[in-house]
Amino acid sequence: MKKHLLILLLLSFIIGFSQNLDLIRKEVEKINNTKNFKIKTIPNDYFVDIKNEATDNGQELKGYYKNNQLKKISHFVGLSAWNIVTEYYYKDNQLIFVLNSKYQSVSENGFLEKPKLLYRNRNYFKNNKLIKKIEEETSEIFDFIKLSNELKKDLKNYK
């Protein structure tokens, strides 16, 4: 009897977990299909002059708003040999998903015409906690909650 109860509990946990991921995927798809966002762009000058953050190929931050609610942040960081693009997705002002991609931008022959995707990692969140991480490639460990909050603050403060 205890064995059956344990199996039942385990199955209900797995089903609930899968439903959470499906709901997040649907919300991300909905955000990506949304048209007519109000977009706020923060150029590289802000990062260099205000935050004292200089990178070889610059930074750019974009906030995507619908009905005055932040739905997505896109953060581009250009380093010497690669670019990192991190996209943060929100529902009800809560981080739900982060897509972190790294592209090679320079080869031994110089700059690549089209940057080559090196990896794309997916991070799923619920109630400000990481619930699932899908890595194509092991990468640096980032505190995406903290980074998200810092970027939201930058969007709020930038005039």
Residues covered by each model-derived region:
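Sec-dependent N-terminal signal peptides
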Residues: 4-14
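Buried hydrophobic residues that stabilize the cores of well-folded domains
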Residues: 19-159
